[in-house]
């Protein structure tokens, strides 16, 4: 129910609830302000992708973002497939780019966590290689805790070219790399920056890391050789956020 509350009402195309949910939450739909179709518990379980559904399901309109949205430069939140712009007054302020770039990320939980963390850390958007996990994967959606409805994202077929494009626009690109010569918290992220995070098992592909302006590493103690992709992304994004709060 919490995630449904986070969805902008104009994006909800259809809403379904189970008989049990309606019985336990008689005032919920009225307070939500969206009409819902009631399904029997059996039918609801059939259409749901979880074993123990909570009893509420929304069909939501997909939105298309642009690179300007990812960089925090666009006054419009996003672009719908119809081509119409959905205005969001809260997003009219142009922000300093703070981008997370994901190369062949595969785990839905990791991507969802990165969305949630990116919003909390003040990132402007997420750039993904076309072979990364689908943002609309149900597991991704749930693990974002609603951040997917607010954090711009954009898939690209040629990630190395996209990284070079960021650099050409004055956005310094940092590749999280085990062989990074620079320590992450000794860099300056107060200007436009982008952090490159690689695949869970293989890290960044060479053709991607070679395009970065700088290779950085996160010092670690003990016998740990690397961090989870979502954890590494969180460390870097929050360091940028910390520096920008000064």
What are these regions (language model features)?
Residues 117-121, 135, 140-148, 206-246:
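Structured adenosyl-cofactor binding patch, chiefly the S-adenosyl-L-methionine
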Residues 20-22, 41-44, 131-133, 200-202, ...:
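Short, acidic/turn-prone active-site loops that include or flank metal/cofactor-
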Residues 36-40, 154, 216:
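General small-molecule cofactor/ligand-binding pocket signal
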Residues 70-72, 95-101, 211-220:
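Glycine/charged-rich beta-loop-alpha catalytic/anionic-binding loops adjacent to active sites
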Residues 1-51, 79, 83-87, 92:
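N-terminal positively charged helical leader segments and presequences
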Residues 49, 56, 60-73, 91-94, ...:
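Acidic/glycine-rich phosphate/pyrophosphate-binding loops and surrounding catalytic core
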Residues 174-224:
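Active-site/ligand-binding-proximal alpha/beta "capping" segment
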Residues 1-10, 17, 73, 79, ...:
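RNA substrate-binding interface of SAM-dependent RNA methyltransferases
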């Amino acid at each position: 129910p919490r995630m449904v509350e986070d969805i902008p009402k104009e994006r909800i195309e259809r809403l379904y609830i189970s008989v049990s949910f309606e019985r336990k939450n008689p005032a919920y739909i009225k307070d939500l302000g969206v009409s819902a179709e009631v399904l029997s518990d059996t039918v609801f379980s059939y259409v749901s992708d979880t074993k123990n559904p909570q009893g509420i399901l929304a069909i939501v309109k997909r939105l298309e973002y642009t690179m300007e949205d990812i960089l925090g430069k666009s006054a419009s939140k996003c672009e719908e497939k119809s081509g119409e712009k959905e205005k969001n007054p809260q997003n009219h302020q142009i922000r300093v780019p703070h981008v997370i770039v994901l190369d062949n990320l595969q785990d839905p939980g990791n991507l969802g966590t990165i969305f949630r963390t990116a919003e909390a850390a003040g990132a402007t958007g997420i750039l993904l290689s076309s072979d990364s996990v689908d943002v609309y994967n149900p597991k991704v959606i749930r693990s974002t805790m609603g951040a997917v409805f607010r954090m711009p994202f954009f898939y690209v077929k040629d990630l190395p070219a996209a990284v070079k494009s960021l650099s050409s626009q004055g956005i310094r690109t940092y590749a999280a790399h085990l062989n990074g010569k620079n320590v992450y918290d000794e860099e300056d992220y107060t200007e436009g920056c982008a952090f490159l995070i690689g695949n869970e098992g293989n890290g960044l592909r060479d053709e991607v890391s070679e395009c970065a302006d700088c290779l950085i590493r996160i010092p670690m103690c003990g016998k740990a050789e690397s961090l989870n992709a979502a954890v590494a992304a969180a460390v870097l994004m929050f360091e940028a956020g910390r520096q920008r709060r000064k």
